[in-house]
From Swiss-Prot:
Organism of provenance: Mus musculus (Mouse)
Residues carrying Phosphoserine: S60
Disulfide bonds: none
Name under which the protein is recorded: Complex III assembly factor LYRM7
Keyword Phosphoprotein applies: yes
Record-stated family: Belongs to the complex I LYR family.
Biological-process GO terms, alphabetical: cellular respiration; mitochondrial respiratory chain complex III assembly
Keyword hit for Cell division: no
Domain of life (superkingdom): Eukaryota
Gene that encodes it: Lyrm7
Length: 104
């Protein structure tokens, strides 16, 4: 896959992730859309392969961070926030063990 195709794929992936992470939050969806588009437009004339690779890494890191670390919260009262976790954020809650057992 050529570099322009990889850039386009990252662009689309970021937008898909944005839609999942900020689902039902019009303001956040719009802000993320504007920021993604702005950053890609700002660097659209970049020709240096090293610089493009560096920006692709940054974009991939941002996508991973959005997907794994951002959680929505809804104000239900003036001092109450209801968290809305996505299924991919929920992991098995394994209790901590001070004395691990040795494998036989």
């Amino acid at each position: 896959m050529g570099q322009p195709a990889k850039v386009l794929q990252l662009f689309k992936t970021l937008h898909r992730t944005r839609q999942q992470v900020f689902k039902n939050d019009k303001r956040a969806l719009e802000a993320a859309r504007v920021k993604i588009n702005e950053e890609f437009k700002k660097h659209k004339n970049e020709t240096s392969p090293e610089k493009i690779k560096e920006m692709m890494k940054l974009g991939s890191d941002v996508e991973l961070l959005l997907r794994t670390a951002v959680i929505q919260g809804i104000h239900t009262d003036h001092d109450t926030l209801q968290l809305v976790p996505r299924k991919d954020l929920l992991t098995e809650n394994v209790p901590y063990c001070d004395a691990p057992t040795q494998k036989q």
